[in-house]
Amino acid sequence: MSRKKKSRKPGAAGAPEFMVTRNRSESDVAGRLRKKDKKRKGLKAGGRNSEEGAQQKHGSSQVRDPRLGSKKKIPLIVEPAKKLTKQERRLSAEQELEMLENDAKLNVLLDRIESGENLGRGLQQYVDEKLDRIEQLMSQLGLLEPEAEEEFEDEAPVRKSRSDDDLLADFEDFDMDDYKG
């Protein structure tokens, strides 16, 4: 009698296990399937591209790239640029003036100037540009009151034009000794 090898399975020592009997065709089919699976152990060729395609199919209903396939109609005839009317320009000037008057940075810098602080060259230039633009917009909109220059002219003494002889006489009469220390 031939010798049987000992099995390490726990149930092998006591009761014999039931043997599954298959006919030859079933075992052939099972063997072929195992062999086929062994051949295809690795990843599919071109798997990188096919996986992205599968992910796009699942996510296409949720996330869509807005750059692809725009449905916006494009005009084939170029229309000339519409010029702004005076009223529209005035509105835009009013809006710009409002924006400049509410400029937080400019207000802070003006407060610093009023408190006697000296600003740097760049900040002072910024303030000057903005104030000039405000003045220009106010004059454009007719909000700027004309300065009273006539009053200053009346207060200033009017100099008479002097002749060359008068100037020469003043020069000759001038005494340098009065200014020596």
From Swiss-Prot:
Protein name stated in the entry: Der GTPase-activating protein YihI
Listed Acidic residues bias regions: 146-155, 166-181
UniProt function note: A GTPase-activating protein (GAP) that modifies Der/EngA GTPase function. May play a role in ribosome biogenesis.
InterPro entries in alphabetical order: YihI
Annotated segments matching region Disordered: 1-75, 145-181
GO molecular function: GTPase activator activity
Family: Belongs to the YihI family.
Keyword entries, A-Z: GTPase activation, Ribosome biogenesis
Bias type Basic residues, positions: 32-43
Basic and acidic residues composition-biased segments: 156-165
Subunit organization: Interacts with Der.
Coiled-coil residue spans: none
Domain of life: Bacteria
GO BP, sorted A to Z: ribosome biogenesis
Annotated source species: Vibrio vulnificus (strain YJ016)
Gene: yihI
